[in-house]
Structure formats: structure tokens, C-alpha cells
Amino acid sequence: MMLGLIKPTSGSVFINGKDIENENNRTKILEKVNFISPYVELPKKLTIEENLKVYGKLYGVNNLQNKISDLMKQLNLLEFKKRKTGELSSGQKNRVSLAKALINEPDILLLDEPTASLDPDVGDYVRTIIENFASQKGTTILLASHNMNEVERLCSEVMMMKNGNIID
């Protein structure tokens, strides 16, 4: 709903005081919202670098090549930059998805199980990158996770759900 892909059955979705259903608002709002999910595939025939260039150009990112290099360095992807995403491990794909989501320095970052496919050390490293990014850029993070340690580390406020209903 926050991305405008699904209409709410009741009520409205407002981001920064603007109704996402209003066509005039939607494009401007979505330029500063990004999303990561283990269920969203990256284009398999493009390299990591090509994937990031596509997303960077879509968002009109300035100094794109420097931004791509910085993100690949931060996420330990430089040595794989010419590898096609279809050849990557799930953990590497996860880090490419994170780089893609951070490329436009979003105001809001929606994270669906951002470290689910990562080993503990890489997961911890990715959480550190997310924390640092959010604190440096003032980004709001909305996190869906079954990992309560991750929730405690990344979230200042927590809402628990069960069967689609808020319970806490």
C-alpha cells in the first residue's frame, strides 16, 4: 500500500502529509521511498554494476558512477561488479538489492527480511550499513522481520502483528 501498488480496503495512506492515491503526489513521493524484499528478483542477465546503473538512472542520481562504487565497496561487492546477478549467491543478491535501494538515498526504506539469506557475520555487517545510512541520512526504516534481535537493533518503535492484526 505504501508503494501505491495495492489500494487500501478502507482509509488512506499518507506519506509526509501527502495522500499516495493522489496521482500528482505519487511520483514525487515514490522518488524518495525504496523497498527491499527477498521475493523481488533482480534482472538476471545484467551485471551488478549494470543493475545499479539502471536504478540510478531511473532515480536521476547525480555522480552515479561514484555512488555505485561507494555502495559496492561498502557492501563488499566490488570484486563481483562484472558478474551477472543470475550467477550470484542469495546473500550476494541480497546485498545488491540493498545497494539498489540505497542508491537514491531514500527518505523511507521498506525492508522485508533484509538479512534472511545472509550468514550471521554478513547479516550483522548489513545491519550496520542500514543503521549508519539511516542515522547519517535521517531515513525512516519500516522493517518486517521475524528476527527480534534485528528489530531491536534497527527500530526505535515496534508494532507486532498476528494474522494481519496489530497486537502490540
Say what each PLM segment does.
Residues 109-112:
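Catalytic Walker B motif of ABC-type/P-loop ATPase nucleotide-binding domains
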Residues 84-88:
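Conserved ABC ATPase signature
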Residues 53, 57-80:
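Conserved ABC ATPase "signature" region
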Residues 124-136:
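Helical segment within the ABC ATPase nucleotide-binding domain
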Residues 11-22, 29:
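Conserved ABC transporter NBD signature motif
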Residues 3:
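Helix-to-loop junction immediately C-terminal to a conserved catalytic motif
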